[in-house]
Structures are given as structure tokens and as C-alpha cells.
Amino acid sequence: QYTPEACRIDLRPLARRAGARFIEARVSGLTSSPAEVHLSDGSALSYDLLSLDVGSEVDDRALQPLGPRLWPLKPLDVFHERWQTLLQSPPEAVPRRLAVVGGGAAGVEAVLAASAAWRQRGRTLSCVLVTGPRGVLPDHSPAVRAHVQAALSMHRIECLPHRAVGTPDGLLLDDGRHHPADLVLAAAGARAPSWLRDTPLALDARGFVAVNAHHQSTSHPNVFAVGDVCSRVDQTVARSGVHAVRAGPVLAHNLGAWLSGQPLHTYHPRRWSLYLLSTGSRQAVLSWGPFSAAGTWVWRLKDHIDRGFMARFGSPSVSPSPPSPPSAPPSAASGPHA
């Protein structure tokens, strides 16, 4: 429903406006003495004050035996390129049995978008969503789950409330059944970046950076972190994009305050977050605490909010493409909004 360009934010002009130097590279590690961030090209950056917002990885370790049949949704650019190549392949070369592992928002949107892409191209695709024992969207209200389940049922997408491990030709479910699959999309949970294990930073039990209410490292006061890469030690905060966005102004203040010796601010997560989940064909489901709704008007609301967010950062036009088959599961561009 959107072009890839409309879903990207170009960081270069943002960095120029802020007077910052932009470096495109992957982090491979960091040290505190000397205080350096190490990059995958072998170079290092010295720091006095460090802010981490590098996100998380898809936890697909149990699915690794699938080999080339396993496609994690992250990194999104890699996934998108593979998906586009797949859509352009001749009918005899495309999968007929798709499984998506993950019962959260990303898994739901991915399986519905994939189903729509095949359906609108006149192709047959058998889709299943493997959710784990808690089922679809376990942290949302029963009404939201019912809306999503109705959308899945309408498109004949089977839900399997089981844990699964990968095999060379499909998935082995925790009830002993084997589910064959030509392609498996991994959207199951977040895993901390592996390089964090070798740093001096205090981590939680799952390997994420432990931070206090100011989003400051509990072990290194000159290191801050927001988003999926960190875990609050004072309360449980869901790994949701909305918190990375809303913590931004607090982080900006705290970085300046730390440098000038001023008091730090606390990030107070809202009790409820607004989720707008695309279910295909310009339909969407709204979830806000105990409240829910579904329909075209929800998609229009989502579209309006997403366009506004992208426009704030000088993105190219985010007008929807002309009505055409979906080009990729939109999981990375959807989810929490406020």
C-alpha cells in the first residue's frame, strides 16, 4: 500500500540540521576504558556521552534448522529485497505453503499482507500463523483479538497455538505434529544484540541494557539507552515502538542535563498505547487498552497518523500507491501509534 521510499526516513539531512556527523555502519562492540564504540569495519569512535537506540533482533534461534526456508523480518531492507524478488518469480518457483511464527502485531500483519499479495496476484498460498500457547495478540483485549481472528478466518489463515522449532522442511510443533512449510517468516519476539554480551554494561537476564527511570545505564552513568535495546529496572515497559518515540524528548533533555550537571527527567510510560493494525485491503483494527474498533475508517486514521509522522522528518511523499497488490508485509511500519 506504500512504496518502500515512503517508509524510510533519510537520516542524513536530519543529522546535517542538527550539526551532527552521520556514519552508516554496524556496531560490533563497545568499551568503557577507553570509552569507545567499535564498528564492524574495524574503526572505533571515542565518546564522553553515549546514547544507544540500536533496537533488537528477531529471536529465531529455535527456527535455524530451516536453513534457507527461514526469513526473519529484520533487517527490513534485507527482507524487503528478498520479498520483491519472490513476488517477481515465475509461479513454479514461488512457495505454496507459508508459515509465520509470532502471534504479536508483526506476525499478524505479515501473514495477512502475504496472503493478500498472493490472492491479488491470482496465486494460491496456504498460510498458517504459529502463535505460541497464548494465542493471537495475547496482551490485547478480547475484542481486539476477536477482530483479528475474524480477519484471519475470513482469509482462511489457520492459527496454531503452539510453540515450534524448525526442521529442514517445516516446523515441529510442541504437540508432536510436523507442519511442512516452503517458507517461514520469523516474527517471534525480540532478542538483544549479541555484541552487548561482551560489553561492560549491566544487562538484564535476557541480555538487554539495564536502565533506570531516566533511561540511564545502571552501571555506566554516561551511557543512556531507549527502545528495544534496553529494559527498565524499576518497572516493566513493553517493547513497543511508541516508547522509543515518546522517550525521545526525555532522552534529549537528559543528554543535555548530564553534560551540564542538571537534574535528569523521568520517562513515564502511558498506561495504554494506541495500536492500529493493518489487516489488508485497506482495513485495520484499533486497540487502545480495553477499547477496540475495526474497519476502513481505522485504516484511514492509521494512514493519516503515519503520513503525519513521516512528514515531520522530511520524508518523501507517503501517499499510498495506486491500488495494487501489496508488495511486502508492512509489519515494520505498523503497530503502536500513540
Q: What kind of feature is each model-predicted range?
A:
Residues 229-279:
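A conserved FAD-binding loop/helix module that cradles the flavin
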Residues 68-94, 171, 178-246, 253:
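FAD-site-proximal beta/loop scaffold in flavoenzymes
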Residues 207-224, 267-268, 281-291, 298:
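FAD-binding beta-loop-beta segment adjacent to the flavin cofactor pocket
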Residues 1-49, 140-158, 336-338:
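N-terminal Rossmann-like dinucleotide/flavin-binding domain of flavoprotein oxidoreductases
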Residues 281-338:
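C-terminal auxiliary extensions adjacent to catalytic cores
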Residues 17-99, 185:
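FAD-binding core/adjacent interface of flavoenzyme oxidoreductases
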Residues 1-3, 112-162:
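Rossmann-like dinucleotide-binding cores of NAD(P)H-dependent redox enzymes
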